[in-house]
C-alpha cells in the first residue's frame, strides 16, 4: 500500500525566515566579516537584509560556497521603510547583548522590524510572547506538563519552556510583543532575566537544571505602543535593562504611498483578486492619513487631529478594502467614492466625536484643494454628505 503525503497547507502569511530564505543564505555567504557569537549574519548584512540593497544586485565572492539554488547575484528586497541609522543602532544594541525595546505609535512596523531583526540574527522569528493583561509569568519563564509532573514529579522532562527560555537555551533572540500590556509584576520577571541572563527553577533545586543559563547569542526584543489604552507603566528597573528606539511614521509621502500600494496589492492578491486602485486614489488616501496624523496639511494648513491613530497599517487596510470592492463589485461605483466612508469608519474607532474632526478636515483642506482645481479633491468634496451619516 502506497501512502501519499498531502501537500503542505497554504498559509496566509509566510514567516520571514521562510519567505526570505534565499536572501538569508546569500547574505551569509556574501559577507564573511566578523559576527557576534551565534549570529547567522554579520551586523552589516543584518542591516542590508532589513533595508535592502537599494536596487543594486550584490555579487558573491568567487570562492563563496552556497547551497544549491542560491544565485551568485541577488537584489535584496527593501523590507523596512525608515531610517537606516535607526536600524544600525538596533543591530549594535543586539550585538552588545543589550535588550532592545522598540516604541512608537501603533502601526509603525515595530513588530515587523523585530521579526526581521530576529530572523536575520538567529534564523527564526517564532520565539515570541504576545503581551496581554492575561499574560502570566509562566509564559515568560516556564510551565509544567502536569501529566508528567504527577507521574514523575518535578523533572527536566516535565518542564515546558517558554519561548524566552527556549531562546536562552539556543542562544537565539526572543520577542515580547506589547510588553506594556502585561501587568507590572509580570513585566518585572524580565528584570533578573535580562541582568543575570539566567532563570532559576526552584522546583529542580539540587540538580544541575536548577539554573537555566543563557547561551551566547541570547537576546530579547520587546515592543510597546505609546498611544494605546490599557497599558501598564514599566518600572525604572526594567527600563534600565533596555535600549529604547522610537519607530516613527514614514516621513516621505511618496515612500509611504509606495508602501501602502505594495502591501495592499499583496494582501489583495492573496485573496485571489486583482489590484485596481488608481495612483490618484492612493495618493489622496495617504495624504488624508498624513494630514490627520500630523495635525497639519502638506500646504501648512491646520488640521484638528483625531484621537484615533491614523497609522500606515490602517491606510494599508483601507487601500486593500478599496481594491477588494473594485474587484468584487466592478462597475457599481467609483472607488474614490468609497474613500470617505472608510475614513469615517477609521476615525470613529476610538471616539465617535472624531467624526466631527473629519468633517472639519473636509471643510478645510479638502475644500481648499477642490477650489484650487484638483479633480480628485473636487470629487471628494462633493462626497461630504457621506460624512453626515
Predicted regions and their residues:
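AAA+ P-loop NTPase catalytic core and its hallmark functional loops
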Residues: 4-271
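Surface-exposed polar/charged interaction patches
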Residues: 29-33, 266, 295, 368, ...
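Charged, glycine/proline-rich intrinsically disordered loops and linkers
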Residues: 46-72, 282-299, 365-373
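Conserved AAA+ ATPase small/helical "lid" subdomain
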Residues: 84, 257, 263-337
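Short alpha-helical scaffolding segments that buttress acidic/His motifs in well-ordered protein cores
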Residues: 90, 285, 342-343
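Exposed alpha-helical structural elements
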Residues: 163, 255-259, 280, 284, ...
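C-terminal engagement/docking regions of AAA+ P-loop ATPases
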Residues: 327-389
